[in-house]
């Protein structure tokens, strides 16, 4: 692969990594809020012992769990892109040395 192509791919991967990290930061904040909401709903369900409060807790927990899965997916994407970036950097160094 040519040096210019490697540099272009590195730039693309770097831009995507930046965007994913920003999205991950937003998701972290949203997840914290959803977990707090689910915890509050759990306490209300324990105190009130009503079916409605129980359903609200279940729904809030489901939202928090879905966001946690989304966060895990994003973190996996970041890891894959970081590995790809490392590989591209290794190839670029090898290209420059040859």
Regions found by a protein language model. Name each.
Residues 47-70:
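Short, glycine/alanine-rich amphipathic alpha-helical segment
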Residues 3, 24-31, 75:
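Amphipathic, non-membrane alpha-helical segments in soluble helical-bundle scaffolds
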Residues 10, 14, 35, 57, ...:
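Generic structural concept
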Residues 1-17, 89-98:
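Short, charge-rich amphipathic alpha-helices with coiled-coil/heptad character
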Residues 17-24, 63-84:
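Amphipathic alpha-helical coiled-coil segments
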Residues 27-52:
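Extended alpha-helical coiled-coil "stalk/arm" regions
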Residues 52-58, 86, 93-98:
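Charged, alpha-helical coiled-coil and adjacent rod-like segments in eukaryotic scaffold subunits
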